[in-house]
């Protein structure tokens, strides 16, 4: 009712209602963990120096939370997206690798909004065109349709959380 969290190894993201923030927060969690011999740090590994942060100040598993067109996207770190298209898995042809990697990177770029998406796809498509390869990156509108189709499979925010947490 007042606390929801997602945990992956030593990474976590926790939402705490304002009603509890005075007694249960990042600082009190760090203090309790210290008493059991564990060190609790925020995502910057600088320690817990504040009781809480706004969602737009948090990262989790290399994702930050961006308001794009009135919805919050869990956007992958830009450096990670740009690095994705620089690597090739063994056993794939150049075209297979490009199709696989660039379509995934294109969707990740889409989550940052149209400005970054257009810059990113222009860079990738320009380079691939010069090599005679086709990126397979969908248009921004196609990613919008794909996202709408995916989100329409859920009937509530609870369904989405259950999908994300595997419960």
Explain the meaning of each model-derived region:
Residues 45-46:
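Non-transmembrane, aqueous-exposed alpha-helical and coiled segments at domain scale
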Residues 19-31, 35-39, 49-167:
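Active-site and adjacent loop segments of nucleotide-processing enzymes
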